[in-house]
Amino acid sequence: MSSSTLQASLFLRPPLHTSSFKLYPCLFSSSSLSFCPQSLSSFYRLSSVLHNSRFRPLPCSLRQDNVASDSDFIPKDSAFEVTDSAESNRLVSDTEVSELETNDRFVGGEETKSGGEEAEVSNGVTEGKEEDQKKSKFRIVVLMMALWAAIKRAIEKVMEWEWLSWWPFSRQEKRLEKLIAEADANPKDAALQGALLAELNKHIPEAVVQRFEQREHTVDSRGVAEYIRALVITNAISEYLPDEQTGKPSSLPALLQELKHRASGNMDESFVNPGISEKQPLHVTMVNPKVSNKSRFAQELVSTILFTVAVGLVWIMGAAALQKYIGSLGGIGTSGVGSSSSYSPKELNKEITPEKNVKTFKDVKGCDDAKQELEEVVEYLKNPSKFTRLGGKLPKGILLTGAPGTGKTLLAKAIAGEAGVPFFYRAGSEFEEMFVGVGARRVRSLFQAAKKKAPCIIFIDEIDAVGSTRKQWEGHTKKTLHQLLVEMDGFEQNEGIIVMAATNLPDILDPALTRPGRFDRHIVVPSPDVRGREEILELYLQGKPMSEDVDVKAIARGTPGFNGADLANLVNIAAIKAAVEGAEKLSSEQLEFAKDRIVMGTERKTMFVSEDSKKLTAYHESGHAIVALNTKGAHPIHKATIMPRGSALGMVTQLPSNDETSVSKRQLLARLDVCMGGRVAEELIFGLDHITTGASSDLSQATELAQYMVSSCGMSEAIGPVHIKERPSSDMQSRIDAEVVKLLREAYERVKSLLKRHEKQLHTLANALLEYETLTAEDIKRILLPKQEGEKFEEQQQEEGDLVLA
């Protein structure tokens, strides 16, 4: 038998036990469970324990059945004899054995250290051999065999002790190290992780729990089973069980759910919900800043000051940049009298302005009275001595008022062209801007420039932008108005400067501005009458080729209520229509088209309207026309159409035969009846269930007209001749509403009775509208009335429509 074989057979490596890790934790590291270098000193302590316990190996006797005759350990030439006596069987004395025990040391469990033990035993035998020079080589070999057999049996008995179960053995250590290395190298290999956990569970179940809960490795069902087994072995499962004393709920279902996810390879979710397990507590930190009220107030004050300073700096820098930019354009930074800045007024002088851009009184038509007064002002400027020799003074201000489009600005342009003096003009909205004080400064600049060129005229268009009644919340506008009041009639007299202004809303102007001394003359520019409309049409048609059928007087009579702007638009639309059609001259048909477009709106020929809707619209408009033809005081019909125009599906237009300055009660009641004609016709022909929303605008107009008659004109017997304010008492408002409803119901009944009497004419006119779509007044009369009766009815209607209420 070889030496290595003998060593392998004698060296016992018992399995590790769990208690060894509990008793001697210093021998193992927490991560890899490898043996520490401190184990060597522990081995020395074990050796001293064995020595103190007087451990001695049992005597070894060699018998024939123990040693073969052909053994390598028995020399062939020796005179060894096998005997049965006790003395002959005793190979080593007690003294020699004690000396060998004293020199014996345990160094380790590795094979290299066992070789060291052989060397120590050999040294002991050599010392014994020196003492007994007579012993032979054969006895030394037998002594070694007996010694190793005794050591083997002693180690087997010692290893059975629990407190020595920590003995490190290289084979199991290397196996664990190999499994740990492979598992760490492949964290997503569930098979390797399961094998490692199973091996650790045999020796260190606490390590299984720790490794599993680190969540750094993928596990399968085997790993989960090993984890549960470790929890049971270490009694860590009690952390997830309910506790009736403390009221702790059971977290075992959450644990099992988590293990189910872990078995599927999910490592992202938390192991257990925070706050359920003691290992995963829910940490709550209470923050209670100990800041006094004074400190908090100081902090808020400092932050507010810093924010205010920052905003102020940004505002100042922005204003400076804007001022610099405007100054570079000739604005605020470079203002001054005579400069090209926005403060400098615009001057219009006939000597420096081309003649084509200047209007004269020859271009002003339809307002002879206003033009006459302005001609007197121009004459005063041209020849002041003619008026001053009798003590007359130049008027300081002239205010032009009137409806939009009547020619107020045109009159100012005519004065600029007629007068031989400088003409300064500004719009009311040009005074004010984003900076406070700009308006007042521009007013001063305007009058300073005018003083240097007196006598002159200053014209302010739309003066209500700055001259309206002063209000508390419009401080910047008040400053501009105050400066204007001072310049017009203040402490310093401005001789030779006439201020002209135009506005559509004279009622909202400040009384201080409209008083004598500032605006001495108030000139109203009304809408033109028939003669004025004829003059305006001749002016705009001048220079345009016209056909022989154009009757300017007829157009003027057929456009009551048109102002100068409307007539200019009419001629322009007709000219465009003629150009589109390729006509060489303007015809009456084109002028009539322009008139209808202004009065009735643009035709919508492409709009799809169903036959039922057309039929309903035809009867609706026929009801209006029948009532207008058979009601005293109603305006003559201009046209009736079911062609969609603007937002309406059809309409009946009426134009007064003469210019109206006031309206009688009969005419107002006739308007109410005409408004009700469409709704009553729908009800009579189609029934109450088929009336439509087409009459909503008619009812709205009728209600407003009845309200106006009762509350403003005093045309109600129950209310009396009283003008009701905007906010009457509740009792008065109830009485007004009752009278309005009464007027509307009476009109409804009158129209219903009238249409029942003329139902045949209603059907005839509706069928004609369905066939022709548009009918003029002559067409309607020719269809419904005989020729003589139609002429007689027209004369009677015009007589009844004359003015009866001044």
Curated annotation (Swiss-Prot):
Cofactors demanded by this protein: Zn(2+)
Cell location: Mitochondrion inner membrane; Plastid, Chloroplast thylakoid membrane
Active site: 621
Cofactor details (free text): Binds 1 zinc ion per subunit.
Biological processes, Gene Ontology terms: proteolysis; PSII associated light-harvesting complex II catabolic process; response to heat
InterPro entries attached to this UniProt entry: AAA+_ATPase (IPR003593), AAA_lid_3 (IPR041569), ATPase_AAA_core (IPR003959), ATPase_AAA_CS (IPR003960), FtsH (IPR005936), P-loop_NTPase (IPR027417), Peptidase_M41 (IPR000642), Peptidase_M41-like (IPR037219)
Region feature Disordered, mapped onto this chain: 106-130
Induction of expression: By high light.
Pfam families per record: AAA (PF00004), AAA_lid_3 (PF17862), Peptidase_M41 (PF01434)
SUPFAM superfamilies recorded: FtsH protease domain-like, P-loop containing nucleoside triphosphate hydrolases
Recorded GO CC terms: chloroplast; chloroplast envelope; chloroplast thylakoid membrane; mitochondrial inner membrane; mitochondrion; plastid
Residues holding Zn(2+): 620, 624, 698
Membrane topology type: Single-pass membrane protein
Keywords: ATP-binding, Chloroplast, Hydrolase, Membrane, Metal-binding, Metalloprotease, Mitochondrion, Mitochondrion inner membrane, Nucleotide-binding, Plastid, Protease, Thylakoid, Transit peptide, Transmembrane, Transmembrane helix, Zinc
Primary location recorded for the protein, binned into one broad class: mitochondrion
Transmembrane segments: 301-321
Entry EC number(s): 3.4.24.-
Classification via SMART domains: AAA
Biased composition (Basic and acidic residues): 106-116
Residues annotated as transit peptide in the record: 1-63
Family from the record: In the N-terminal section; belongs to the AAA ATPase family.
Assembly, per entry: Homooligomer.
Described function: Probable ATP-dependent zinc metallopeptidase. Involved in the assembly and/or stability of the complexes I and V. Involved in thermotolerance but not in high light stress resistance or in the assembly/stability of the complexes I and V of the mitochondrial oxidative phosphorylation system.
Remarks, miscellaneous: In contrast to fungi and metazoa, plant mitochondria have more than one i-AAA-like complexes.
Protein name: ATP-dependent zinc metalloprotease FTSH 11, chloroplastic/mitochondrial
Organism per entry: Arabidopsis thaliana (Mouse-ear cress)
Source species taxonomy: Eukaryota, Viridiplantae, Streptophyta, Embryophyta, Tracheophyta
